[in-house]
Amino acid sequence: MLRKPASTPVQLTFGPMTWETPIPSRDGRQVFIKANDVRGELVRYNRLSGHVEPFLGGISADMLDFSRDGKYVVYASFPGDILWTANRDGTQVQEVAKAMAHPTGPRWSPDGSQIAFVDFPATGPAEVYVVPSRGGTPVRVLPENRCCDELDPTWSPDGKQLALWVAPSEGNTETELRIVDLSTRQVSLLPRPPKRTCSPRWSPDGRYMLAVTNTYPDTDGLEVYDFKTRKWRILLTEQVGWPPVNWPSWSKDGRSIYYMGPDDLQRFHGVVFRISVDGQKPVRIADLPGFRPAGWLYNWFGIDPDENPIMLRDAGSNEIYALTLDR
């Protein structure tokens, strides 16, 4: 409360909610302000039952990735951007990548010993790091890069290389998919695809590199690079309208890809598709009318070791309050 005019700012709000867009009343006695309770509920679409159910106790977390053997999981808390590892059932929680600014997008190495992730510092471009999965000091993958965002790391099946997307720098609209040899730090580039791409995903058998076509700031299709033929192929043509094609994940056998996209009428309500790597027509896996996504990147989705879709549901609230000022 304001009991008398003050020459210094006075805090009006407290607690876990975030407050925004304050507007004073005409008589100056009140302030109308929007309060946001930002949190999510992790849910899984059970493909056998066709029902949505809480996952890992419904924690508020996203960016999940499971170890290759399916025994462990890494995720980012929401809000807060803290990386945690745990057993598959959510027990034995341990923080990794401490003292980072905003770590997210974690990926287990094939042998489970390391985790690659992206950190968004307060200033400067995003950076890719690798950290021991049991905790330790993160090591930057491309320490010489100072101009471009490094995003979406993906492991080669043998764990010796990382592929990542280098986003457009200021004044440059091109993107690059780089492959880094982790023992030598030598960098190679994938051949330029027909369309600009982002979000690489190495197939489990190592033959393919999947990428999302990127007509910045939107993503609208899928392309795949065949390391055997050394050629790109368009797997899914552009999806017109919003939302974009997002968050592709390989099936365990490497024969198909799960992704989130719009329905036939270009509406977004939690639609998950699967498409085979040979380019057959996409199959609708989950259709969730009324689903409201949450998370730092809003419409994240992944799959669990049994290939059930997992998503973060918006469990927060938005209210408008009137704060009376005591003069």
Can you say where each PLM-predicted feature lies in the sequence?
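C-terminal recognition in membrane/secretory proteostasis and scaffolding
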Residues: 263-265, 278, 284, 302, ...
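Structural motif
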Residues: 1, 39-43, 80-84, 123-129, ...
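A generic "binding-loop/recognition-motif" signal
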Residues: 18, 38, 48, 60, ...
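Short loop/turn segments that connect beta-strands within beta-propeller blades
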Residues: 2-7, 46-50, 87-91, 132-136, ...
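An edge-strand/N-cap motif at the start of beta-rich repeat modules
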Residues: 2, 7-10, 29-33, 40-47, ...
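A structural motif specific to WD40 beta-propellers
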Residues: 10, 53, 93-94, 139, ...
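Conserved beta-propeller blade repeats
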Residues: 11-34, 54-76, 97-119, 143-167, ...
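Surface-exposed loop and edge beta-strand positions of immunoglobulin-like domains
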Residues: 34, 45, 76, 86, ...
